[in-house]
Structures are given as structure tokens and as C-alpha cells.
């Protein structure tokens, strides 16, 4: 009887622990897949069109050609709802899909508000893109633990200065 109880304990305890720990996971994969490819060929391009300093940000939306000064090409893609390109407080580049994961609509996109949080205009969810990797800090997204979709930002594999990709 004690061996049976020990075996059950060894099976049940890890399952319960795994179930409880999964509750704290931020779901940042709610949006459908969409191509992302924003290329900055040189450091000068990055400084001119990208984000240059700590807590800086720029919106990239292919359909609206936003920002207008960026050299758009046929190979430029900006995800599901556009790309919010920013830097954290240490100047490290970050990128997120602008579509609110609560609304899941390419037409409902977050914008940086006066408190430096990304805010959804419809559900008023708030996301910290500068310190919490797009994690939710208010509104329905915080209640459901829905974060912004995170994109990769790094040096290109063909010599580009910086590339934003999925």
C-alpha cells in the first residue's frame, strides 16, 4: 500500500505543479501568422528610419505606408496589424505586432499612450513594451494574460545592419 501511494504521489505532484505553473504563462501567440520583414541595410538607415535611443518607438504599417519616409519595397511585410518597433530602457531593439491580442483584429491596433504603455483603443488593455516584453499590465489582456506577439530583431544573415522578422 505504501509503494502504491508513493507511486501515485510521484505521478500526481508533478502533474499538479505543471498545471499550476502553466496558469502564469503569458499567451503571446493569439494572432494568426503573418509575414514580417523590415530591413535596415546600414546603421544610417537604422538611425534614420528605426529607433535610435532608449524608450524610442516607431510604427510600421505596410498598408498605410507608415512611416512615409521609410523606403518601402515589395519584400517589406509588417505582420498582422503592423509592427511596433521600439527599444527598451537600455536601448535594446524590440518589435511587437500592433494588433491587440484580445480583439484579434488587424484593424484594432495598440498605440503608445502618455504613460508610455501600449494601449488598445477598443478594450483599453495596456501592455508594457519597454520593460515587460509586451506583457499585459491592465485591462482584459491582464485578466486573461494575453501579451503582444513578439518579433525578432537582429543583424541580418546577408550583411544587413538590422532585420525585423517573425
Feature names for model-found ranges:
Residues 18-22:
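C-terminal motif of bacterial Sec signal peptides marking the signal peptidase cleavage site
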Residues 26-112, 128-131, 149-166:
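N-terminal pre-ligand scaffold of iron-sulfur
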Residues 144-147:
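Conserved SAM/SAH cofactor-binding pocket of Class I
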Residues 5-7, 23-27:
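Secretory/periplasmic and organellar redox-cofactor proteins
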Residues 17, 94, 114-117:
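Processing junctions and N-termini across compartments
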Residues 127-139:
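Short metal-binding segments enriched for Cys and/or His
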Residues 1-11:
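Bacterial N-terminal signal peptides that target proteins for export
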Residues 116-125:
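Cysteine-rich micro-motifs
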Amino acid at each position: 500500500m505504501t509503494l502504491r501511494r508513493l507511486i501515485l504521489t510521484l505521478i500526481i505532484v508533478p502533474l499538479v505543479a505543471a498545471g499550476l505553473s502553466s496558469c502564469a504563462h503569458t499567451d503571446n501567440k493569439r494572432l494568426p501568422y503573418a509575414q514580417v520583414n523590415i530591413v535596415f541595410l546600414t546603421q544610417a538607415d537604422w538611425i534614420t528610419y528605426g529607433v535610435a535611443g532608449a524608450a524610442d518607438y516607431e510604427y510600421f504599417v505596410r498598408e498605410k505606408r507608415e512611416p512615409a519616409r521609410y523606403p518601402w519595397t515589395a519584400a517589406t511585410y509588417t505582420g498582422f496589424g503592423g509592427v511596433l518597433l521600439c527599444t527598451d530602457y537600455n536601448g535594446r531593439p524590440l518589435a511587437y505586432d500592433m494588433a491587440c491580442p484580445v480583439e484579434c483584429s488587424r484593424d484594432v491596433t495598440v498605440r503608445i499612450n502618455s504613460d508610455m504603455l501600449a494601449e488598445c483603443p477598443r478594450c483599453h488593455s495596456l501592455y508594457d513594451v519597454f520593460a515587460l516584453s509586451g506583457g499585459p499590465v491592465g485591462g482584459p489582456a491582464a485578466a486573461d494574460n494575453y501579451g503582444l506577439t513578439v518579433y525578432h530583431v537582429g543583424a541580418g544573415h546577408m550583411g544587413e545592419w538590422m532585420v525585423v522578422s517573425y
